[in-house]
Structure formats: structure tokens, C-alpha cells
Amino acid sequence: MFSFGFLITAVVFWVVTKVIYNAYFHPLRRFPGPFLNRATRLAYIYQVLGGKIHHSVLAMHQKYGDIVRLAPDELSFSHPDAWEHIMGHKKADQEEMGKAPWFYRTFKYEALSIVNEDRKPHARLRRPMSHGFSEQSLRDQGPVIRGYVDLFCQRLREASAKSQLVVLSDWLSYVAFDIVGDLSFGEPFGCLKEGKEDEWLTSMANLGTTGVIFQCLGFFPWIKEPLVMIFAKTMRKYRDAHLSSSTEKMRRRIEFNGERPDFIQGLLQKREQLNLRLEDLVSNAQLFIGAGAESTATLLMGVAYLLLKHDRVYEKLSDEIHSAFKNVDEITLTSVGQLPYLNACINETLRYYSPACNGLPRMVPKGGGYILGEYVPENTTVAVHHWALYHREKYFADPDSFRPERFLGDLEFANDQLKALQPFHVGPRNCLGRTLVYGETRLIFVLLIFHFHLRLAEESQNWMEQRHWLMWEKSPLMVHLTPREAVLC
């Protein structure tokens, strides 16, 4: 009994001492934030697991300013210049702020890819891979992308013939995954053809909550490691099922006799020089699917909802599209880039409903560094949280309203800090897929609005009331879909 009481006393003493140290003696003590966040990592974990940390971070920045202490060893920066300071290019003698291992390497057995490799291996992979994401490659990929978008329109026409009430979110997800699947593995997932998700994709619905739980457990390895051991067999079975399917797809892509304008071509050409194993190719292709297709599908759903939620915006965009194109043959990946209001709608969606939403954390290197003029000690986790920054009135007028005009020089938004919007990030690790995402999104919405009249269903009026973990928790987006007369898909 004495030993148990002594143990409890010791634990309580340690916890109280740790809390006092974190709040009042830690190297980050001068940075403001709520007491519980400054004192313990548990407050942050509670906010993350609740799926509403983007609201919490915004509230903190509104109260405390551009720099907030989210946890004892973590800072959030909410300022347009913070992007470059954290993620930007460094001088030759400067060490970059590397990606936080607890966020990017959740499991020890994970294969490394361009997203979680260290600086030098990342650059080694990125150079040959970047060719597949260039403007020229996008033009070469045009027929492939157009084929899937035309099939998307055809399947919507068939679906609307059965019922004008269509689950548009499903079809937007199908077209996004089929396009990226083809450009990653050389073949689609067959979602559009079958009218349903591939099993490989269905399991991604659990990725957000499962992934964020294990990320949070990473702060408590004495809990995480036993759990990983307990569930190792189940997790390995889940992983191997995906790996087997992906590996077979990659084998077929490698055996393809000829060049394709896809994401993998550059790596295949440099495979021997870079000493790339089959699993390295598979890991990067899976990344394109997991990150690229999911975020693109999220953007597509966001654009659709926000357009249909705002009749004025939808009608103005519809007028722009029908004024620009008289027949479907005029619609190409190149021509859809010349629509200023459409571009503004996409940018405003990226601001209002950022697919990334929260921060992608970096680590301050040895010797510390300066961010927004403030010295930050080494081993501090730092990040810019997209949603919170984009919804601050300090940088965007009327931030909680969907106003594409802010990207068209409207005087009402003359003081907006548009450089704060960095959905694809900055620096040597910025997202390669920017050109593809914009091109694909433009083409899909021009053809969708050219072929159909859309109206938001009553049951989806509050669709954007969502929680966010690694991805948004999206409910079905229901839309009334009516084919336009005399338009053939």
C-alpha cells in the first residue's frame, strides 16, 4: 500500500513539475497561447482528435496574434511571410527545416517517398519526377485526361436519366482517382466504368482518423509501440493487400513497351542511375494516389458546393463558360485556362475550403532559426495552418464569405494579402501537382456546366459543416442534375 501511494505521489509530482516547467521555464515560454496548450501536449491532442483544431487555431491567432504556442514544443505562425521563412529555399550553408518525423513517418515500416525523404534524397527523386508535372507534360496528358472527363459526363447523363438527384461527390471522386491512377500506374481504377470505388480506395475513408490517432500516439511511444505490436498482424495484412495490388499495377506499367506522359516515366528512365527498387516506384505512385487524387477530389467537391450554394456566382460562371464556348470541341485544357472568373472561383475555394486545412509541420534544425524576426530554438515544431490563416480578417476582407472577386482586383479586397494563399506550399518541397490540379479542375467544371444545369439538393445545404483529420470528413454531396437541351456528351 505504501509503495502504491508513493508511486502515485511520484507521478503527480512529476506531472505538476512538468506542467510548471513547460508553462514558465521552457525555452518557448515567451510565446503566447492558452495555458493548457503551453503546459501539456494533451490539449493539442484533444483538439486534433475532435476534428476541429482548425477552428481552435484560428481562435488562438485572433486572440494572441501571428505566433501562437500550440503545444509545449510547437508554434503556429499565421502570417504571409511565414511560408518562406519555414518552407522556402535556404542558402547553401543553411540547413532546411525538415519535415517532422512524428507527422510524416507514422510507422517505422513505411517505405520512403518524395514526401517524407530527407533533403538530398528528395531532390534526387524530384528532378526526374518533375518532368511528368510540367506544362508540356500536361499538354501531352490532355487526351488521357479529356477521355476520363468525357466518360464522367457520360456516366452523369446516364445517372440523371434514372434520377435527377445525383450523388455528385461520388462521381467527382471517381474521375479524380481514375485520372491520377492512370497517370501513376498506367491504368485507371475503373471507378467511372463500374460506377463505384475500387476496394483500394474505399479503405482510404479510414485513413484520416486512423492516421491521426497514431500520429498523436507518437508523442507517447510507451503507449504506441505496444499497440503497434498488438495490431501488427492486422495492420500488416491491410498494408500487404494494398501493396500487392499496387505492385501488380506497377509491374504492368514497367512492362509497357514505350513512353507515356505520366508521373512515373521520369523515374523509370533514371531507375538504374538512381538505384530505384520496385517498392520505391510503388511507394511514390501510392503517394500520388493518396495525396494527389484525394486532395483533388476534395477541391472538386468544394468548388461544386460553393458554386451551387451561391446562385449569383454559379450564374456568372455559367455565363462566362457559355459565352466562351459554342461547341464542345472548343473546350481543351489550354482554352479553359483563359476564363478569369473560373480561375477566381478555384482560388477562392482553395482559400475558403483548403484541402490541406491544417499545418504540415517542420522541425527547426540544430542551432535554431528565425521566423518572422523571432528566434526559434532547435527541435521546435513549426507550421502555418492553412484554414486559420485564410480565415483571418487581418489578411482577407470578409474572410467567411465566398467572394471570387477578391482575385479579380475588386477594390473591396484591395488590402487582401493574396500571397498568404499557398495551397501548394513554397520552396524546394512545394507540390509538383499544381499545374495538373488547376488544369483538371478547370476542364471538369467547364464540361460539367456546359453539359448540365445543377442545383444543390436540400439535404446538402450544410454539406461544408465538416470535421478534419488528415482529410475532411465529407458526407454525400447531393445535386439535382438536368442535361442541357441540344448538348450531346
Curated annotation (Swiss-Prot):
**UniProt keyword Magnesium, yes or no:** no
Q: Which residues cross the membrane?
A: 1-21, 212-232, 287-307
Alphabetized, the UniProt keywords read: Coiled coil, Glycoprotein, Heme, Iron, Membrane, Metal-binding, Monooxygenase, Oxidoreductase, Transmembrane, Transmembrane helix
Drop me one GO molecular function for this one: iron ion binding
One cellular component (GO) term of this entry: membrane
Q: Broadest EC class?
A: oxidoreductase
The primary location reported for this protein is membrane
| E.C. no | 1.-.-.-
Pfam families in the record, alphabetically?
p450
Q: Which domain of life is it from?
A: Eukaryota
According to its UniProt entry, the protein's GO biological process terms are: mycotoxin biosynthetic process; terpenoid biosynthetic process
InterPro entries hit by this protein: Cyt_P450 (IPR001128), Cyt_P450_CS (IPR017972), Cyt_P450_E_grp-I (IPR002401), Cyt_P450_sf (IPR036396), Cytochrome_P450_monoxygenase (IPR050121)
- The reply on keyword Cell cycle is no
Question: Needs which cofactor?
Answer: heme
Q: Please state where this protein is localized.
A: Membrane
Residues at which heme binds: C431
Which positions does UniProt annotate with glycan attachment?
Answer: N347, N379
Q: In which pathway does it act?
A: Secondary metabolite biosynthesis; terpenoid biosynthesis
Tell me its family.
Belongs to the cytochrome P450 family.
Function, in words: Cytochrome P450 monooxygenase; part of the gene cluster that mediates the biosynthesis of paraherquonin, a meroterpenoid with a unique, highly congested hexacyclic molecular architecture. The first step of the pathway is the synthesis of 3,5-dimethylorsellinic acid (DMOA) by the polyketide synthase prhL.
Which protein, by its recorded name, is this? Cytochrome P450 monooxygenase prhB
- The organism is Penicillium brasilianum
